[in-house]
Amino acid sequence: RSAGHIQTYYNHKSMHYYHPYRVTSSKPLWHFGHGLSYTEFEYSEPVLDCTKLKQNGTLTVTFNVKNVGSRDGEEIVQMYIRDEKAQVARPVKELKGFKRVFVKAGESVAVQMTVTPEMLSFHGLDMKPVVEPGDFTLMVGPSSEDSILKTIKFTYND
C-alpha cells in the first residue's frame, strides 16, 4: 500500500460505516496535515465566544496547545468545519483555517481562530453560493485524523 494507492472521497454522508471499497480500507495512509516533529503537543478542548453565528457576525474559537515534549517546537494548528445537514452532499470536514504556533518545551500557548459566515458557504443546487442555516461542527487539531481532533458545535442563523 502506498500514499497514492487508492482514491479517497470526501463528499459523502458522515456515517461511521461508510466504506466505498470492499477489498481494502478507505482510510488514507497518511491523513492531511500529518507530519513528524521533535516534540509532542496536546490540545485543550475548544471554547467558543458564542454558540450562534449570525449573518454579519463572527465567532471566535479559543484553545490551548501545550508542548509536552522536552524540546521547543512549532505546530501547524488546523481548523475544520462540517455542515451537519445541507441540500447537497458536503465534505465530511473542510479545512477552514490554519495557524503556525511556536511553543517552548513545557509551556502552553492560547490560540484563537475566527469563523465567518463566508466560511460556511457552498454552491447550492442552482450552482450559486449559499449559506444555509443549521448546525455545524468545528474541529481543531494537528491533522485531519478524526481520533485526535477536538470538536465543538455551533449553529448559524441568517
Roles of regions detected by a PLM:
Residues 1-74, 80, 105, 133, ...:
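Secreted, periplasmic, or luminal enzymes acting at the cell surface/secretory milieu
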Residues 27, 98, 144:
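Glycine/Thr-rich phosphate-binding loops that ligate phosphate moieties of nucleotide
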Residues 44-46, 98, 152:
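Generic beta-strand hydrophobic packing signal
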Residues 58-60, 108-112, 149-151:
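Intrinsic-disorder/low-complexity, polar/charged segments enriched in Ser/Thr/Lys/Arg/Asp/Glu/Gln
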Residues 68-70, 84-86, 118, 143-145:
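Short coil/turn motifs at secondary-structure junctions
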Residues 70-87, 93-95:
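Short acidic, flexible loop segments centered on an aromatic residue
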Residues 87-123, 127:
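Intrinsically disordered, low-complexity Pro/Gly/Ser/Thr-rich segments with frequent PxxP/GP/PP motifs
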Residues 116-158:
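Terminal connector regions
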